[in-house]
Amino acid sequence: MTPGQVIIVDNPYGDVHARFGGYEHAVETHAVLQEPPHVAHIQLSPALTADGHYTIAPRLPAGGIQQPSQRIDLSVLVPEGHDLRVRTGAGFIDVHGVRGNVDIKSEGGNIELRGVKGAIQAETTGGAIEASLGRAPHGARQRLATTTGDIDLGIDDDLDAAVDMATSALFATDFSLDVTQHPGEEPNKRARTTVGRNASSLAIESRRGQIRLRRRAGFTSVGGASSDATAKQDGDEDNDSD
């Protein structure tokens, strides 16, 4: 791979798990395939696309139809400095510790984000979103959106972002909100707050799901010394390949 090359994972047949993969410009992919006998085989052949992106896109042969018990789940180790784009059908997407911008979308699966060192765009139709965010990149315009699912978001006091939220369900938060009602619209409530400095923006949207915006507290040791750095490392530097 070349430095800065975008990694695209497009898996309509199952889940995608992405983790930080080190500092060398190389992608490592693991696949778990489940197939009944005598069905069209899901093929996996990573390749460079015409626009220079590195693409991991399993596909059935032309005319093949996915069977109910047939799926392929992917685990991808993403090197530092490479942006990641993920697409699934109803598959679950979780991204932990990736050090680049992340753009993910599922047609109906749940999304989990933790320790991402870049700007985030995440969208699902009917699934829920659970995320833990640290300081946003300066000037970033981040967005978490679902049509009907809940959004549960933990953030630091130094997020440094103007936060806009919208839903027709409930807001539950540790932060003070400026809430406005919009009767007859969907979503019918909007809320705004600023966490830290107003140096970026974060939009959180669900038409009908609850939005929970929680403060991530720093850890205090038994001796009374604050260990915020340790807590951040535990929450943000998630480099395992689970």
Where are these predicted regions, by residue range?
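Intrinsically disordered, low-complexity terminal regions
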Residues: 1-242
